[in-house]
A protein has these predicted regions:
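Charged helix-capping and loop-helix junction motifs
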Residues: 209-216, 242-247
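Short glycine/serine/threonine-rich phosphate/pyrophosphate-binding segments
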Residues: 24-30, 199, 204-211
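Active-site gating loop/helix substructures
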Residues: 138-199, 203
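A short helix->loop->beta-strand "cap" motif at the edges of active sites that frequently abuts
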Residues: 37-38, 222-226, 260, 298
Length: 350
Protein backbone atom coordinates (compact mmCIF):
# COMPACT_ATOMS: atom_id res chain seq x y z
CA UNK A 1 0.00 0.00 0.00
CA UNK A 2 1.34 3.40 -0.97
CA UNK A 3 0.70 6.67 0.84
CA UNK A 4 0.22 9.12 -2.02
CA UNK A 5 0.61 12.83 -1.40
CA UNK A 6 -2.07 15.17 -2.70
CA UNK A 7 -3.39 18.67 -2.21
CA UNK A 8 -6.07 17.30 0.09
CA UNK A 9 -3.74 15.13 2.20
CA UNK A 10 -1.15 17.87 2.59
CA UNK A 11 -2.06 20.64 5.04
CA UNK A 12 -3.69 20.69 8.45
CA UNK A 13 -4.81 17.06 8.03
CA UNK A 14 -1.20 15.90 7.90
CA UNK A 15 0.57 14.57 10.99
CA UNK A 16 2.63 16.75 13.27
CA UNK A 17 6.24 15.84 12.55
CA UNK A 18 9.35 16.92 14.45
CA UNK A 19 12.46 16.26 12.32
CA UNK A 20 15.70 16.59 14.27
CA UNK A 21 19.18 16.85 12.79
CA UNK A 22 21.12 19.12 10.49
CA UNK A 23 23.07 19.40 7.28
CA UNK A 24 22.29 17.96 3.86
CA UNK A 25 20.63 14.81 5.18
CA UNK A 26 17.86 16.58 7.07
CA UNK A 27 17.17 19.06 4.27
CA UNK A 28 16.91 16.19 1.76
CA UNK A 29 14.22 14.51 3.83
CA UNK A 30 12.33 17.77 4.33
CA UNK A 31 12.00 18.23 0.56
CA UNK A 32 9.97 15.06 0.41
CA UNK A 33 8.00 15.43 3.62
CA UNK A 34 6.64 18.89 2.83
CA UNK A 35 4.44 17.29 0.17
CA UNK A 36 2.58 15.36 2.87
CA UNK A 37 2.09 17.84 5.70
CA UNK A 38 2.42 21.50 6.63
CA UNK A 39 2.65 20.60 10.30
CA UNK A 40 6.36 20.00 10.01
CA UNK A 41 9.01 21.36 12.36
CA UNK A 42 12.72 21.02 11.62
CA UNK A 43 14.85 21.28 14.77
CA UNK A 44 18.41 22.04 13.76
CA UNK A 45 21.82 21.79 15.42
CA UNK A 46 23.85 24.99 15.93
CA UNK A 47 27.25 23.47 16.74
CA UNK A 48 28.82 24.06 13.29
CA UNK A 49 32.00 26.14 13.38
CA UNK A 50 33.47 25.51 9.93
CA UNK A 51 33.13 26.96 6.43
CA UNK A 52 31.07 30.05 5.74
CA UNK A 53 28.98 29.49 8.86
CA UNK A 54 32.10 29.49 10.99
CA UNK A 55 33.28 32.77 9.48
CA UNK A 56 29.96 34.50 10.21
CA UNK A 57 29.91 32.99 13.67
CA UNK A 58 33.37 34.33 14.52
CA UNK A 59 33.10 37.72 12.83
CA UNK A 60 29.47 38.61 13.57
CA UNK A 61 28.79 36.66 16.74
CA UNK A 62 25.70 34.93 15.35
CA UNK A 63 24.74 31.29 15.57
CA UNK A 64 25.92 29.28 12.54
CA UNK A 65 23.34 29.79 9.78
CA UNK A 66 24.32 27.07 7.30
CA UNK A 67 22.25 24.11 8.49
CA UNK A 68 19.23 26.32 9.17
CA UNK A 69 19.56 27.88 5.71
CA UNK A 70 19.62 24.45 4.02
CA UNK A 71 16.40 23.47 5.78
CA UNK A 72 14.83 26.79 4.77
CA UNK A 73 15.71 26.11 1.14
CA UNK A 74 14.18 22.65 1.34
CA UNK A 75 10.88 23.91 2.77
CA UNK A 76 10.63 27.07 0.65
CA UNK A 77 7.65 27.58 -1.64
CA UNK A 78 9.20 30.15 -3.97
CA UNK A 79 10.38 30.41 -7.54
CA UNK A 80 13.29 28.09 -8.42
CA UNK A 81 15.55 31.09 -8.99
CA UNK A 82 15.11 32.11 -5.34
CA UNK A 83 16.20 28.68 -4.14
CA UNK A 84 19.21 28.88 -6.44
CA UNK A 85 19.98 32.34 -5.10
CA UNK A 86 19.91 31.15 -1.49
CA UNK A 87 22.44 28.43 -2.28
CA UNK A 88 24.69 30.62 -4.44
CA UNK A 89 28.28 30.78 -3.21
CA UNK A 90 30.53 33.68 -4.11
CA UNK A 91 33.50 32.39 -6.15
CA UNK A 92 36.09 35.03 -5.25
CA UNK A 93 36.96 38.05 -3.15
CA UNK A 94 36.38 38.48 0.57
CA UNK A 95 33.07 36.64 0.29
CA UNK A 96 34.62 33.62 -1.45
CA UNK A 97 32.82 30.43 -0.40
CA UNK A 98 30.08 32.30 1.45
CA UNK A 99 26.47 31.58 0.46
CA UNK A 100 23.93 34.30 -0.21
CA UNK A 101 21.42 32.51 2.03
CA UNK A 102 23.82 32.66 4.98
CA UNK A 103 24.33 36.38 4.42
CA UNK A 104 20.59 36.96 4.19
CA UNK A 105 20.06 35.19 7.50
CA UNK A 106 22.91 37.20 9.04
CA UNK A 107 21.29 40.43 7.83
CA UNK A 108 17.93 39.40 9.27
CA UNK A 109 19.67 38.58 12.53
CA UNK A 110 20.94 42.16 12.65
CA UNK A 111 17.47 43.52 11.96
CA UNK A 112 15.65 41.22 14.38
CA UNK A 113 18.07 41.26 17.27
CA UNK A 114 17.95 37.49 17.80
CA UNK A 115 18.73 34.45 15.70
CA UNK A 116 15.41 32.82 16.55
CA UNK A 117 13.47 35.83 15.27
CA UNK A 118 15.70 36.06 12.19
CA UNK A 119 14.88 32.45 11.32
CA UNK A 120 11.17 33.17 11.74
CA UNK A 121 11.42 36.22 9.46
CA UNK A 122 13.26 34.24 6.80
CA UNK A 123 10.56 31.60 6.95
CA UNK A 124 7.96 34.26 6.18
CA UNK A 125 10.02 35.64 3.30
CA UNK A 126 10.33 32.19 1.73
CA UNK A 127 6.76 31.09 2.55
CA UNK A 128 8.10 27.81 3.90
CA UNK A 129 5.97 24.76 4.64
CA UNK A 130 6.12 24.25 8.39
CA UNK A 131 8.87 25.93 10.36
CA UNK A 132 12.57 25.71 11.18
CA UNK A 133 13.90 26.15 14.72
CA UNK A 134 17.44 26.23 16.11
CA UNK A 135 17.60 23.66 18.91
CA UNK A 136 19.06 26.29 21.25
CA UNK A 137 19.97 29.97 21.26
CA UNK A 138 23.16 29.20 23.19
CA UNK A 139 26.61 29.66 21.64
CA UNK A 140 27.95 26.10 21.87
CA UNK A 141 30.94 24.14 20.62
CA UNK A 142 31.11 20.41 20.04
CA UNK A 143 33.73 18.34 21.87
CA UNK A 144 34.62 14.80 20.78
CA UNK A 145 36.25 12.22 23.04
CA UNK A 146 37.92 9.28 21.31
CA UNK A 147 38.18 5.72 22.55
CA UNK A 148 41.84 6.29 23.47
CA UNK A 149 40.89 9.23 25.70
CA UNK A 150 42.04 12.02 23.37
CA UNK A 151 39.78 15.08 23.07
CA UNK A 152 39.18 17.80 20.52
CA UNK A 153 36.91 20.86 20.67
CA UNK A 154 35.24 22.24 17.55
CA UNK A 155 33.17 20.38 14.98
CA UNK A 156 35.49 21.45 12.17
CA UNK A 157 38.46 19.82 13.93
CA UNK A 158 36.90 16.40 14.52
CA UNK A 159 37.68 14.97 11.07
CA UNK A 160 41.43 15.59 11.24
CA UNK A 161 41.62 14.62 14.91
CA UNK A 162 39.95 11.29 14.22
CA UNK A 163 42.39 10.60 11.42
CA UNK A 164 45.30 11.35 13.74
CA UNK A 165 43.96 9.25 16.61
CA UNK A 166 42.99 6.38 14.30
CA UNK A 167 40.24 5.13 16.61
CA UNK A 168 36.51 5.54 17.03
CA UNK A 169 34.69 8.43 18.64
CA UNK A 170 33.46 7.32 22.06
CA UNK A 171 31.15 10.23 22.75
CA UNK A 172 30.56 13.91 22.06
CA UNK A 173 29.45 16.71 24.38
CA UNK A 174 28.63 20.40 24.20
CA UNK A 175 30.77 23.22 25.56
CA UNK A 176 29.43 24.75 27.71
CA UNK A 177 27.39 21.81 28.95
CA UNK A 178 23.63 21.78 29.45
CA UNK A 179 22.52 24.63 27.16
CA UNK A 180 18.82 25.38 27.41
CA UNK A 181 16.63 24.19 24.57
CA UNK A 182 14.44 26.60 22.68
CA UNK A 183 11.00 26.28 24.34
CA UNK A 184 9.29 26.07 20.95
CA UNK A 185 11.55 23.16 20.02
CA UNK A 186 10.57 21.18 23.12
CA UNK A 187 6.92 22.00 22.49
CA UNK A 188 7.16 20.77 18.89
CA UNK A 189 8.69 17.49 20.07
CA UNK A 190 6.14 16.94 22.83
CA UNK A 191 3.19 17.63 20.49
CA UNK A 192 4.51 15.60 17.55
CA UNK A 193 2.77 12.52 16.18
CA UNK A 194 6.04 11.41 14.64
CA UNK A 195 9.61 12.19 15.70
CA UNK A 196 12.41 11.69 13.17
CA UNK A 197 16.12 11.63 13.95
CA UNK A 198 18.40 12.02 10.93
CA UNK A 199 19.47 11.38 8.32
CA UNK A 200 22.77 13.18 8.66
CA UNK A 201 26.23 13.02 10.18
CA UNK A 202 25.78 10.95 13.33
CA UNK A 203 28.10 12.77 15.74
CA UNK A 204 28.04 16.27 14.25
CA UNK A 205 24.46 16.74 13.00
CA UNK A 206 22.13 14.37 14.86
CA UNK A 207 23.54 13.65 18.32
CA UNK A 208 24.39 17.30 19.22
CA UNK A 209 20.65 17.99 19.39
CA UNK A 210 20.23 15.27 22.02
CA UNK A 211 22.81 16.98 24.25
CA UNK A 212 20.73 20.13 24.65
CA UNK A 213 18.87 20.13 27.97
CA UNK A 214 15.39 18.68 27.72
CA UNK A 215 15.55 17.36 24.16
CA UNK A 216 16.35 13.69 24.86
CA UNK A 217 14.03 13.63 27.90
CA UNK A 218 11.16 15.07 25.87
CA UNK A 219 11.70 12.55 23.06
CA UNK A 220 11.73 9.60 25.46
CA UNK A 221 8.61 10.86 27.27
CA UNK A 222 6.68 11.25 24.02
CA UNK A 223 4.10 8.68 22.92
CA UNK A 224 4.83 9.52 19.28
CA UNK A 225 6.44 7.04 16.93
CA UNK A 226 10.20 7.65 16.89
CA UNK A 227 12.17 6.76 13.76
CA UNK A 228 15.90 6.91 13.16
CA UNK A 229 16.64 7.44 9.47
CA UNK A 230 19.88 5.56 8.94
CA UNK A 231 22.50 6.98 6.60
CA UNK A 232 23.12 5.39 3.21
CA UNK A 233 26.91 5.32 3.59
CA UNK A 234 29.49 5.35 6.34
CA UNK A 235 31.25 8.70 6.72
CA UNK A 236 34.99 9.19 6.46
CA UNK A 237 36.36 10.90 9.56
CA UNK A 238 33.31 10.08 11.65
CA UNK A 239 31.74 6.63 11.25
CA UNK A 240 34.18 4.47 9.26
CA UNK A 241 33.36 0.80 9.76
CA UNK A 242 30.03 1.51 11.44
CA UNK A 243 26.96 -0.64 10.96
CA UNK A 244 23.34 0.38 11.46
CA UNK A 245 23.45 -1.09 14.98
CA UNK A 246 26.55 0.97 15.77
CA UNK A 247 24.55 4.09 14.91
CA UNK A 248 21.70 3.03 17.17
CA UNK A 249 24.04 2.20 20.05
CA UNK A 250 25.60 5.66 19.74
CA UNK A 251 22.14 7.24 19.89
CA UNK A 252 21.31 5.24 23.01
CA UNK A 253 24.67 6.08 24.57
CA UNK A 254 23.92 9.79 24.25
CA UNK A 255 20.12 9.83 24.55
CA UNK A 256 19.53 6.65 26.58
CA UNK A 257 17.26 3.72 25.80
CA UNK A 258 13.88 4.68 24.39
CA UNK A 259 15.24 7.48 22.21
CA UNK A 260 14.14 5.60 19.07
CA UNK A 261 11.62 2.83 18.31
CA UNK A 262 12.35 2.06 14.69
CA UNK A 263 15.33 2.19 12.34
CA UNK A 264 14.54 2.94 8.69
CA UNK A 265 17.39 1.72 6.49
CA UNK A 266 18.18 1.58 2.79
CA UNK A 267 18.45 -1.87 1.21
CA UNK A 268 19.17 -0.82 -2.38
CA UNK A 269 22.63 -1.69 -3.72
CA UNK A 270 25.02 1.04 -4.75
CA UNK A 271 26.30 1.08 -8.37
CA UNK A 272 29.70 -0.59 -8.63
CA UNK A 273 31.51 2.44 -10.02
CA UNK A 274 30.13 4.70 -7.31
CA UNK A 275 31.06 2.17 -4.63
CA UNK A 276 34.63 2.16 -5.92
CA UNK A 277 34.84 5.93 -5.73
CA UNK A 278 33.49 5.99 -2.19
CA UNK A 279 35.96 3.26 -1.23
CA UNK A 280 38.79 5.60 -2.17
CA UNK A 281 37.38 8.00 0.45
CA UNK A 282 37.16 5.29 3.14
CA UNK A 283 33.37 5.13 2.89
CA UNK A 284 31.12 2.18 2.11
CA UNK A 285 27.47 1.18 1.98
CA UNK A 286 26.17 0.99 5.54
CA UNK A 287 25.68 -2.62 6.59
CA UNK A 288 22.39 -3.63 8.24
CA UNK A 289 23.19 -6.05 11.08
CA UNK A 290 19.71 -7.31 11.81
CA UNK A 291 20.46 -9.54 14.81
CA UNK A 292 22.18 -6.76 16.74
CA UNK A 293 19.35 -4.35 15.98
CA UNK A 294 16.90 -6.95 17.29
CA UNK A 295 18.95 -7.27 20.49
CA UNK A 296 18.57 -3.52 21.01
CA UNK A 297 14.77 -3.91 20.99
CA UNK A 298 14.41 -1.62 17.99
CA UNK A 299 12.17 -2.41 15.01
CA UNK A 300 13.73 -2.42 11.56
CA UNK A 301 12.21 -1.30 8.26
CA UNK A 302 14.13 -1.76 5.02
CA UNK A 303 13.30 0.12 1.82
CA UNK A 304 15.14 1.01 -1.41
CA UNK A 305 15.89 4.66 -0.67
CA UNK A 306 19.02 5.30 -2.72
CA UNK A 307 19.57 8.10 -5.21
CA UNK A 308 22.85 7.98 -7.13
CA UNK A 309 22.25 11.13 -9.16
CA UNK A 310 25.11 13.58 -9.47
CA UNK A 311 27.69 10.99 -8.49
CA UNK A 312 26.65 10.83 -4.83
CA UNK A 313 24.92 8.10 -2.82
CA UNK A 314 22.14 9.90 -0.98
CA UNK A 315 18.53 9.42 0.04
CA UNK A 316 15.96 10.01 -2.66
CA UNK A 317 13.66 12.66 -1.11
CA UNK A 318 10.46 11.24 -2.61
CA UNK A 319 11.22 7.61 -1.76
CA UNK A 320 12.30 8.48 1.77
CA UNK A 321 9.22 10.59 2.48
CA UNK A 322 6.94 7.92 1.02
CA UNK A 323 8.52 5.24 3.21
CA UNK A 324 8.27 7.39 6.34
CA UNK A 325 4.64 8.28 5.73
CA UNK A 326 3.68 4.73 4.78
CA UNK A 327 5.16 3.39 8.00
CA UNK A 328 3.48 6.11 10.02
CA UNK A 329 0.08 5.85 8.35
CA UNK A 330 -0.30 2.11 8.48
CA UNK A 331 1.10 1.88 12.03
CA UNK A 332 2.57 -1.46 11.15
CA UNK A 333 5.35 -1.23 13.69
CA UNK A 334 4.40 -2.87 16.96
CA UNK A 335 6.59 -1.64 19.77
CA UNK A 336 7.48 -4.24 22.36
CA UNK A 337 10.62 -4.15 24.47
CA UNK A 338 12.94 -6.85 23.25
CA UNK A 339 10.72 -7.80 20.30
CA UNK A 340 11.83 -7.38 16.69
CA UNK A 341 9.55 -7.16 13.69
CA UNK A 342 11.12 -7.06 10.24
CA UNK A 343 9.36 -4.99 7.61
CA UNK A 344 10.13 -4.88 3.91
CA UNK A 345 8.51 -3.01 1.06
CA UNK A 346 7.16 -6.23 -0.44
CA UNK A 347 5.00 -7.06 2.58
CA UNK A 348 1.30 -6.30 2.43
CA UNK A 349 0.19 -4.74 5.69
CA UNK A 350 -3.28 -5.15 7.10
Amino acid sequence: MVYESSASSRCAAGPKIAAIGGGTGLSTMLRGLKKYTDRLTAIVTVADDGGGSGVLRREMGILPPGDVRQCMQALANTEPVMEQLLGYRFPEGQLKGQSFGNLLLAALNGMAGSFEEAVSMMGQVLAISGRVLPVTNADVQLEAVFENGARVVGESHIFNAKKQQDCRIHHVSLVPEHPKALPDALEAISEADLILLGPGSLYTSVIPNLLVDGVADTIRASHAQKFYICNIMTQDGETEGYTAADHLEALQRHGREGIVDLCLANNAPIPRGLAARYSEEDAELLRIDRERIAELGIALAEYPLLSAQGGYARHDPALLAQAVMELYRERTVRIYRGTQQYITEEQEWK
